[in-house]
């Protein structure tokens, strides 16, 4: 199905976490009323009464005329032309469960950097298979863009990924802002998997820091992670792509180094000696790399690509292996 986004297309956002909130902020700043599915009663009440999300980015105040928060998923989706998914991947099915309105006449944009657990599918694959959308009706908004900086107007670079360049440009127009720069790509597979893999690699960096490894080693670890990511993409889905640009390498770097990185934080706790269970309990937000490590290992069983860093993270998270021992063994496999 050929789908063309119109100039007056209306947007709706599914989710109420930090990235969803930052996205709504960008859309609302363009003087377009944004539909917003918020299933948490406390958050919904606060958004309706004072224009703030009390749980995430609560210093961001919305003009209440620019947002239309609702707990009625069908109504939010029905009134939109572009539906933007911004939930943790582990909760996507739960968020969409109440939906009875068909998505087949919508354009769906995933802002999720994770795999749907249990289904072992990327969000793009899941929406295609379960909701009957053509891949030409599905896009991505991604890049090295922590919500905390985007919401505060820090210069950020986003990549819109879409099969149709005109649709990509239309999506970009809705996110446009003084401090937002855009690039465009048609590599749905590569960009989405890069955004998933970088979370696993950020976990490995956090573990290394927690164990006491220094900057010299981190540089080697991240360089090898970049190579491992490229190898996975080239061997699992060969295509002409430059993995040195921001949607691939840039997103990897910011997730590995940033103080805002949830995945680095989870790894840091484990490296400091926390059990995986206690580290997860201490996290206040979802670290996508935890779910991705298991999913990527399952997916890679088909491809049999050499991925020593991802394998190390999986062993620590799911096999109860010693982080110190696994990291030591990994050091001999890096170049």
Predicted region positions:
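Rossmann-fold dinucleotide-binding core
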Residues: 115-215
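NAD(P)-dependent Rossmann-like dehydrogenase/reductase catalytic/cofactor-binding core
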Residues: 205-209, 234-335
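Rossmann-like NAD(P)(H) cofactor-binding subdomain of soluble oxidoreductases
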Residues: 63, 69, 73-78, 82-153, ...
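NAD(P)+-binding Rossmann beta1-loop-alpha1 motif at the extreme N-terminus of oxidoreductases
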Residues: 1-60, 66-71
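Active-site-proximal catalytic alpha-helix in oxidoreductases
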Residues: 155-158, 189-234, 245-265
């Amino acid at each position: 199905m050929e789908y063309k986004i119109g100039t007056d297309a209306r947007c709706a956002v599914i989710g109420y976490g930090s990235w969803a909130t930052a996205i709504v902020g960008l859309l609302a700043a363009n003087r377009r009323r944004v539909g917003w599915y918020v299933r948490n009663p406390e958050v919904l009440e606060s958004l309706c009464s004072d224009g703030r999300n009390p749980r995430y980015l609560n210093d961001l105040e919305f003009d209440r005329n620019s947002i239309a928060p609702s707990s009625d998923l069908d109504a939010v989706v029905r009134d939109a032309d572009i539906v933007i998914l911004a939930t943790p991947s582990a909760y996507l099915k739960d968020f969409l469960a109440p939906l009875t309105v068909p998505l087949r006449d919508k354009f769906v944009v995933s802002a999720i950097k994770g795999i749907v657990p249990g289904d072992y599918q990327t969000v793009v694959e899941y929406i295609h298979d379960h909701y009957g959308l053509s891949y030409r009706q599905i896009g991505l908004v991604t890049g090295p863009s922590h919500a905390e900086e985007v919401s505060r107007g820090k210069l950020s670079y986003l990549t819109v990924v879409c099969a149709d360049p005109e649709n990509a440009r239309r999506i970009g127009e809705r996110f446009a802002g003084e401090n937002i720069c855009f690039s465009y790509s048609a590599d749905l597979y590569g960009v989405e998997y890069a955004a998933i893999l970088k979370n696993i690699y950020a976990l490995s960096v956090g573990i290394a820091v927690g164990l006491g490894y220094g900057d010299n080693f981190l540089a080697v670890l991240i360089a090898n992670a970049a190579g491992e990511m490229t190898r996975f993409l080239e061997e699992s889905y060969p295509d002409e792509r430059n993995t040195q640009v921001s949607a691939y390498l840039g997103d990897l770097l910011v997730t590995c180094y940033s103080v805002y990185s949830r995945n680095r934080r989870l790894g840091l706790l484990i490296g400091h000696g926390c059990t995986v269970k206690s580290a997860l309990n201490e996290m206040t937000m979802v670290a996508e790399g935890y779910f991705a490590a298991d999913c990527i290992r399952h997916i890679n069983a088909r491809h049999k690509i050499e991925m020593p860093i991802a394998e190390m993270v999986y062993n620590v998270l799911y096999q109860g292996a010693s982080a110190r021992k696994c990291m030591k063994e990994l050091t001999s496999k890096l170049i």
